[in-house]
Amino acid sequence: MIPHQYIWLTWALAFLIPWVVIFYAFPQYQKTMWQVSLATAVFGLTEPLFVPEYWNPPTLFNLAQLSGFDLESLIFCFGIGGVGSVLYSVLTRRNNVPIPWPEKRLPLHRHHYKALASPLITFPLLYFLPWNPIYPAIAAMAVGAIATIVCRPDLKTKTWVGGALFMGYYFVFFLALETSSPGYVQHVWNLPDISGILLLGIPLEELLFAATFGLYWSSVYEHLMWHRIVPAQIHGKQKNRHLPTKL
């Protein structure tokens, strides 16, 4: 059995395994994965907002207990960010193509950046309410997902299906954690301050986090970079149009 101090590190590193597999198996998504993963890793620095109110995991060098920060959160966020952004496209064989400039000027997109920033606006507004900080985080990502669908209806399917896929993906990882380290959830999560509802040993809030993270993050790259998704074969045909022909 893994010592408690290294369980969080082991679990965070486990998320890098599918990341590496997808990165090398599907090179067309490498740019997206790198950019989204690096951006998501920054959110690992928000860990002091959740320790010890939401959970209090033993960490390398006891960093979380001493400062609230930890290295594991950076690894974890990096791993889930890249996979969450491309999981739908990998499984449905979709690629990204840029949106034409005239389409960007349509009235539908006038709140483009506000929609993208909506989670960053929502979270601090809700954080100071008398509830556990995990709930404003969940609500903020849900608001971001709704804003994405309103601003970019073409991403609706990717948002909904991507959210469901990521929740299932995260569920498998968490179930492995609970199976390999029984009692870890009760030891680390602040169950009395949250719902206390466990589904196969997994806190309900973790599944809500996974669902809303997947909903927002599955389309964040396309939304931010002004891309849409198309079937891979269509993307290939569009690229071939620009290849020189033999005389």
Predicted regions: what is each one?
Residues 2-5, 62-79, 193-208:
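Short aromatic-rich membrane-water interface segments that cap or initiate transmembrane helices
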